[in-house]
């Protein structure tokens, strides 16, 4: 709606849409919106491909060792949880629980802190600045850090209950590392065999991931607010036709 209003301000304006990880609806618009598509496939100079692996909860010791290896090299680590606090209706990993676990494993030698959406903006900004300056080595967070965070020294992204996140979110979170010249890794922790986790291990191209997300979730409304699901056409198949 906002984009349509902007376009209506001029007479047939040229419009440039930019996206690192298109959601299914955006991908559908490129197919059916008569758009020319240009992709930048090269990584910025000096950056390496991010290695993505899936680990089960029983392999947490291996994950901690992978984190420690990077911390010893003076690198930093993101740890992501789907929830802030424990809930009676859910057994998902929480930021608060991970803070205790990480302090037990690394608290003697490394500074650990948390950030999430319920915190005041000033408090979040202070913690993010400290992380940027390497005054915090392990940052535990919700998906609040999935966009707009650039810390080249952070080389490891650990995502707990990774099967609870969509492909676009996982790809955005993975993009918080690999922003410097050092080799980086993304570790997805889940006991699920979800198809999207296998896709994350094999694919690092944002448009390809969007295409797979399109297949898994549907495209939503082209002229509405729904960002996933089907259009419920009686005959046509949007993907194959």
Segments (PLM) and residue ranges:
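Post-DEXD/H (motif II) to motif III coupling segment of the RecA-like Helicase ATP-binding lobe
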Residues: 1-78
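Short amphipathic alpha-helical segments
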Residues: 2-5, 28-31, 91-92, 150-154, ...
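Structural recognition of the conserved hydrophobic beta-strand(s) that form the central parallel beta-sheet
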Residues: 14-20, 29-30, 80, 138-141, ...
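Short glycine-rich anion-binding loops that position phosphate/pyrophosphate groups of nucleotides
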Residues: 21, 83-85, 144-146
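Long, contiguous hydrophobic alpha-helical segments, chiefly transmembrane helices and signal peptides
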Residues: 27, 31, 37-40, 80-84, ...
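A short, flexible beta-alpha/helix-coil linker loop
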Residues: 45-47, 83-87
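C-terminal helicase module of SF1/SF2 nucleic-acid helicases/translocases
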Residues: 60-75, 96-241
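Glycine- and acidic-residue-enriched helix-capping/strand-helix junction motifs
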Residues: 86-98
């Amino acid at each position: 709606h906002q984009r349509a209003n902007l376009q209506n301000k001029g007479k047939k304006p040229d419009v440039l849409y930019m996206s690192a990880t298109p959601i299914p609806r955006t991908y559908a618009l490129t197919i059916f919106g008569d758009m020319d598509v240009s992709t930048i496939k090269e990584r910025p100079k000096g950056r390496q491909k991010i290695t993505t692996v899936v680990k089960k909860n029983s392999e947490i010791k291996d994950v901690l060792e992978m984190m420690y290896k990077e911390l010893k090299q003076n690198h930093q680590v993101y740890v992501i949880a789907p929830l802030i606090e424990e809930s009676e209706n859910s057994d998902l990993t929480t930021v608060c629980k991970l803070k205790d676990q990480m302090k037990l494993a690394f608290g003697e030698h490394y500074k650990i802190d948390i950030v999430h959406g319920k915190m005041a903006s000033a408090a979040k900004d202070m913690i993010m600045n400290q992380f940027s300056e390497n005054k915090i080595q392990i940052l535990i967070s919700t998906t609040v850090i999935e966009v707009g965070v650039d810390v080249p020294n952070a080389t490891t992204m650990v995502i707990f209950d990774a099967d609870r996140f969509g492909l676009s979110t996982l790809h955005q979170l993975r993009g918080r590392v690999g922003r410097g010249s050092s080799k980086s890794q993304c570790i997805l922790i889940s006991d699920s065999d979800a198809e999207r986790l296998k896709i994350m291990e094999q694919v690092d191209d944002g448009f390809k991931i969007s295409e797979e997300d399109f297949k898994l979730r549907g495209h939503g409304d082209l002229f509405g607010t729904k960002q996933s699901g089907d259009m419920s056409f009686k005959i046509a198949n949007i993907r194959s036709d």
